[in-house]
Amino acid sequence: RLDTWLPIGGTGWYVVKDDFDMVIASKWPIVQSWPSLSRQFAALIDLPSTYATDLLFTAAHLNCCTADATRQNQCDEYVQFVQDAKSPGGQVTVPNGTPLVYAGDLNSVGFAQQLTTLRTGDIQNNATYGPDGPMDWDGTPFTHADCPQTDARMAYTWRSNSSAYPSGLLDHLFFSDAAATLAKSFTLRTDVMAPVALSVLGLQSGDADKPANLQQDAGTAGRANLRFLKSGRLRSQGSSCGLDPSGMFLVLGG
């Protein structure tokens, strides 16, 4: 069905699904996936030989609302996964310099420590998830992509006029800037987009009537090309979608 919705030619999409609500679809083969993380789904994407390494991408849909302790545990668990990936042994090991990308609906409505943990590797429950460690290969924190809306001076990624919650930045993209270069990042919002722009882009005004994360990272000199989209139209129906406009990978989730 995905090949019908978004045809890319060739062998079509490579797809893996976790046991919760996330799907990762890639133009390139998916070497391995790790569905064991709590509400987080990691996959190693086999990039073409023009890239120095493959890409380790993790989609996330963390617990909502007042579940701060659960979200913190999930963030701690992802940091543990990254530390494992960057060192020999364990459940996953990737070569030095492999681009690491973490993106999705983090439901970040509670304590700021959760985002701090994802960015810096500052684990809160060390007894369970092990020691802290830097997230990027060069010993620095992950980079957080700022994604202002395309057609409004706003940066929130979620809004509901019928909800008690205010508009908020709930969806995020973190990446290792030692291995990937950010070229563009923005949040797609079609309901206020000019008709001529909609026509050029092949969009309709209702496609993202709620803000939709469209975050684009493009690399140079063999560095990783990364793209992620969270579709507002699907999100308004209780789903979310990540899309690479150039066809590298697609992420679907709740």
PLM region spans:
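A shared catalytic/ligand-binding motif for oxyanion handling
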Residues: 53-61, 69-75, 162
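Metal-dependent phosphoester-hydrolase catalytic domains
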Residues: 35-38, 87-101, 107-254
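Stable alpha-helical elements in mature extracytoplasmic
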Residues: 1-2, 21, 71-81, 111-114, ...
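Beta-strand-turn-beta hairpins that frame and shape the catalytic cleft
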Residues: 28-32, 39-64, 254
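Loop/turn elements at helix/coil->beta-strand transitions in domains of secreted/extracellular proteins
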Residues: 8-13, 31, 50-56, 95-100
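Active-site surface patch of divalent metal-dependent phosphodiester/phosphate bond hydrolases
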Residues: 1-36
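Active-site-proximal beta-strand/loop segments in catalytic clefts of secreted hydrolases
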Residues: 15-21, 25-28, 58-63, 102-107, ...
